[in-house]
């Protein structure tokens, strides 16, 4: 969503999720509990999506949990992988389970998470493939520059943003001592 109400609701969902994780809930349990809270909030609450990614820096394992969120993209030596979980947003149905995915990351891999506003701005019906093709064409660069270029690419297709457009990127590199 967009606007002050959507911003406030998103902030509340993020803060509740953070509090649950900080108190020791597993990510899966936290997402299920947040979904229940949104259901109980009822009509005054709008649907929300949640997209959580955790990287174990010792093992290089990425854990992605999605509830209604758009795909996450991983750039590696072989190309771009799309991690997607086509589910309804939080707060719509009871019993919705977060989709869990794990991937082993290697030196030089990059992770890209975008809001639905970024994908919605892209042309065509298969927006995930448009993003994948774009990511396959970009040169290697730092996470901030990559995020800026992805946002510029998406914005180039629309006269003005109609929704939140957020890009979050991360890279994984071996520490050389």
Regions found by a protein language model. Give the residues of each.
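Active-site-proximal, acidic helix/loop segment immediately C-terminal to a metal-coordinating Asp/Glu
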Residues: 1-24, 84-87, 94, 105-161, ...
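Catalytic core of PPM/PP2C metal-dependent serine/threonine phosphatase domains
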Residues: 4-77, 84, 98, 154-163, ...
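Extracellular and analogous surface-interaction loops
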Residues: 54-56, 104-107
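Short, surface-exposed beta-strand/loop "edge" segments at domain boundaries and coil↔beta transitions
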Residues: 72, 176-177
């Amino acid at each position: 969503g967009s606007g002050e109400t959507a911003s406030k609701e998103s902030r509340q969902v993020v803060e509740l999720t953070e509090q649950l994780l900080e108190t020791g809930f597993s990510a899966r349990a936290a997402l299920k509990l947040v979904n229940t809270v949104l259901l109980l909030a009822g009509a005054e609450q709008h649907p929300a999506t949640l997209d959580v990614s955790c990287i174990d820096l010792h093992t290089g394992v990425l854990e992605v949990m999605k509830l209604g969120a758009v795909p996450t993209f991983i750039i590696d030596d072989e190309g771009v992988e799309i991690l997607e979980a086509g589910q309804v947003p939080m707060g719509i149905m009871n019993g919705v389970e977060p989709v869990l995915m794990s991937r082993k990351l290697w030196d030089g891999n990059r992770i890209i998470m975008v809001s639905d506003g970024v994908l919605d701005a892209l042309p065509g019906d298969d927006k995930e493939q448009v993003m994948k093709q774009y990511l396959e064409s970009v040169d290697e660069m730092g996470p901030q520059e990559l995020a800026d270029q992805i946002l510029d690419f998406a914005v180039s297709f629309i006269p003005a943003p109609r929704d939140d457009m957020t890009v979050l990127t991360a890279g994984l590199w071996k520490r050389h001592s």
